[in-house]
């Protein structure tokens, strides 16, 4: 694909605001790169037990139906690996990773091949607010390693823009379906110190407010995040990116080590 075409896709992915339009754009890009299908799973940690999962794909309907009906998401080896690494996953080398997979999970790939999904490359994606994505570009034939290796730099580059577009679209949809109040600065401060294991009394001393006020703010956080208690609110705060590490007092390690 020529450079001007790639830049055009980049602009489209940066500005797209509709899920169906995004699916169409990914499909066109996939074909232009020499692949037959794509499959893109976006996982948003609304809850550890029931995260929000959105699938964009251009795979055969028969495969989508079989995959969904047999609950293959939980045993999909691509999903398993993508949640543990950031490097691309080459389908024709999955056997080398078998020891890291659930027993029998490679059967999913054998079944996929029967439906015409025979080779591909998958990119694990990780967002700033705890989102996970897995974008796969797939061939109907057992493509040579040359195609996978030669196209992977461009696919990896563009995957990040596709990922950001999907997050933007899905997050807007979630806010429209279930609008949530934003946390105030003080609520975020209380949640931050609670995540550090501080009691309400200790947080009160740190922030110079009363313990009763701390409990009020943490109760507000619990309500706004739809949590059962402050511990679940902490988990949601960490997974969603509301809570971020404080970099003001960090100890920095340099490599190579600086001269004394």
From Swiss-Prot:
Domain HTH luxR-type: 176-241
SMART domains: HTH_LUXR (SM00421)
Keyword Cytoplasm: no
DNA-binding region(s) from the entry: 200-219
GO molecular function: DNA binding
Keyword set, alphabetical order: Activator, DNA-binding, Quorum sensing, Transcription, Transcription regulation
Transcription regulation listed as a keyword: yes
InterPro entries the UniProt entry points to: Sig_transdc_resp-reg_C-effctor, TF_LuxR_autoind-bd_dom, TF_LuxR_autoind-bd_dom_sf, Tscrpt_reg_LuxR_C, WH-like_DNA-bd_sf
Biological process annotations from GO: quorum sensing; regulation of DNA-templated transcription
Pfam families named in the record: Autoind_bind, GerE
Family: Belongs to the autoinducer-regulated transcriptional regulatory protein family.
Role of this protein: Functions as a BHL-responsive transcriptional regulator.
This protein's name: Transcriptional activator protein AhyR
């Amino acid at each position: 694909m020529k450079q001007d075409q790639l830049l055009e896709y980049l602009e489209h992915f940066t500005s797209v605001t509709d899920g169906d339009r995004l699916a169409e754009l990914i499909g066109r890009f996939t074909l232009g790169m020499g692949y037959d299908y794509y499959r893109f799973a976006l996982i948003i940690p609304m809850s550890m037990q029931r995260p929000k999962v959105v699938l964009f794909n251009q795979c055969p309907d028969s495969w989508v139906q079989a995959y969904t009906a047999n609950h293959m998401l939980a045993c999909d080896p691509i999903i398993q690996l993508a949640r543990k690494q950031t490097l691309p996953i080459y389908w024709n080398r999955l056997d080398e990773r078998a020891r890291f997979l659930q027993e029998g999970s490679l059967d999913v790939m054998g079944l996929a091949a029967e439906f015409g999904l025979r080779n591909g490359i998958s990119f694990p994606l990780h967002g700033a607010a705890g989102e996970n994505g897995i974008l796969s570009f797939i061939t109907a034939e057992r493509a040579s390693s040359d195609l996978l290796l030669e196209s992977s730099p461009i696919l990896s580059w563009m995957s990040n823009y596709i990922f950001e577009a999907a997050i933007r679209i899905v997050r807007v949809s979630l806010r429209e379906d279930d609008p949530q109040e934003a946390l105030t600065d003080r609520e975020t401060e209380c949640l931050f110190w609670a995540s550090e294991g501080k009691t309400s009394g200790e947080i009160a001393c740190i922030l110079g407010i009363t313990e009763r006020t701390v409990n009020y703010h943490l109760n507000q956080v619990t309500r706004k995040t739809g949590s059962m208690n402050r511990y679940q609110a902490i988990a949601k705060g960490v997974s969603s990116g509301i809570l971020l590490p404080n970099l003001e007092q960090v100890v920095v390690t340099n490599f190579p080590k600086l001269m004394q």
